[in-house]
């Protein structure tokens, strides 16, 4: 997922995406704790994707406030 695709989404879609990423991040951390996680890079990717979504949400909020 890249920032260009995220900017095309609505605020509600971004919030849904953020909720999904948080769930995914939780599941990945849980798998790591139980020793079932094979691809540890997924944790970093999920965290960065969540940060991208939050950044776009903040940009949209700032644009709406102006």
From Swiss-Prot:
Keywords from the UniProt entry: Ribonucleoprotein, Ribosomal protein
Domain of life of the source: Bacteria
Keyword Nucleotide-binding: no
Record-linked Gene3D superfamilies: 1.10.287.310
BP-aspect Gene Ontology terms: translation
Cellular component GO terms, alphabetical: cytosolic large ribosomal subunit
Keyword Phosphoprotein: no
GO molecular function ontology, one term from the record: structural constituent of ribosome
CDD domains: Ribosomal_L29_HIP
Family statement: Belongs to the universal ribosomal protein uL29 family.
PANTHER family from the UniProt entry: 60S RIBOSOMAL PROTEIN L35/50S RIBOSOMAL PROTEIN L29, LARGE RIBOSOMAL SUBUNIT PROTEIN UL29C
Protein name: Large ribosomal subunit protein uL29
Species of the source: Ruegeria sp. (strain TM1040) (Silicibacter sp.)
Gene responsible for this protein: rpmC
